[in-house]
């Protein structure tokens, strides 16, 4: 929930940069998972949830304008 509150404070440009960062992080976690080196598998779910939250906020900010 804390991340969602922080995401809501950001403008669209910051949300896009956050989305790119999260997508890169998701890619890196997937590569670690495939190679068997992922020590914290719960991070995949957390990053995926954050990506969904950012995309939802971006869509809602687009509808407002």
Swiss-Prot record:
Keyword Ribonucleoprotein: yes
Species annotation: Buchnera aphidicola subsp. Acyrthosiphon pisum (strain APS)
InterPro entries membership: Ribosomal_uL29, Ribosomal_uL29_CS, Ribosomal_uL29_sf
Record protein name field: Large ribosomal subunit protein uL29
Family stated for the protein in its record: Belongs to the universal ribosomal protein uL29 family.
Annotated keywords: Ribonucleoprotein, Ribosomal protein
SUPFAM superfamilies hit by this protein: Ribosomal protein L29 (L29p)
GO CC annotation: ribonucleoprotein complex; ribosome
């Amino acid at each position: 929930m804390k991340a969602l509150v922080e995401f809501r404070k950001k403008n669209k440009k910051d949300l896009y940069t956050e989305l790119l960062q999260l997508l890169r992080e998701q890619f890196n976690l997937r590569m670690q998972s495939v190679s068997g080196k992922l020590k914290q598998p719960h991070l995949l779910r957390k990053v995926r949830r954050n990506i969904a939250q950012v995309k939802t906020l971006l869509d809602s900010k687009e509808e407002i304008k």
